[in-house]
Amino acid sequence: MALNLQDKQAIVAEVNEVAKGALSAVVADSRGVTVDKMTELRKAGREAGVYMRVVRNTLMRRVVEGTPFECLKDTFVGPTLIAFSHEHPGAAARLFKDFAKANAKFEIKAAAFEGEMIPAAQIDRLATLPTYDEAIARLMATMKEAAAGKLVRTLAALRDQKEAA
């Protein structure tokens, strides 16, 4: 179906606004994936706070101009599904990675985070980023560990001091 100029401008404006507020973006090729599977992916994306859209490549090139995702321009070849993460930078990458494991025909092309393009082979860098809550939990565990270690060293020094006396 042909789009008129106003429709194209509306699509570019809408997706550009989403891109400006996004933390990361992932580009994939969904050729050969059934409609049912794509519907499941879109539902999971909505639950994870990920905006997904299939947009013509020429329009996508205009969408990413002036955004941190401009580095993805070369990946807009063939059928392109793009996902923008708003709540957590690794959400879209994690979603696409899990979906690609279950669907062999789904191919991740690349991702972008803070203006840096991440090739599909290195998508784990983005997908394994801890969430905010996970990062806080790790920090607290490290701090708790350090305090416990300091207590043990203090008690050992006190014991050594008493043995010496």
Curated annotation (Swiss-Prot):
Keywords: Ribonucleoprotein, Ribosomal protein, RNA-binding, rRNA-binding. SUPFAM superfamilies: Ribosomal protein L10-like. PROSITE patterns: RIBOSOMAL_L10. The keyword Ubl conjugation does not apply. It comes from the Bacteria. GO terms for molecular function: large ribosomal subunit rRNA binding; structural constituent of ribosome. GO terms for biological process: translation. One of its GO terms (cellular component) is large ribosomal subunit. It holds the Pfam family Ribosomal_L10. Part of the ribosomal stalk of the 50S ribosomal subunit. The N-terminus interacts with L11 and the large rRNA to form the base of the stalk. The C-terminus forms an elongated spine to which L12 dimers bind in a sequential fashion forming a multimeric L10(L12)X complex. NCBIfam families: PRK00099.1-1 (NF000955). HAMAP family: Ribosomal_uL10 (MF_00362). PANTHER family: 39S RIBOSOMAL PROTEIN L10, MITOCHONDRIAL. Forms part of the ribosomal stalk, playing a central role in the interaction of the ribosome with GTP-bound translation factors. Belongs to the universal ribosomal protein uL10 family. This is Large ribosomal subunit protein uL10. It comes from Serratia proteamaculans (strain 568).
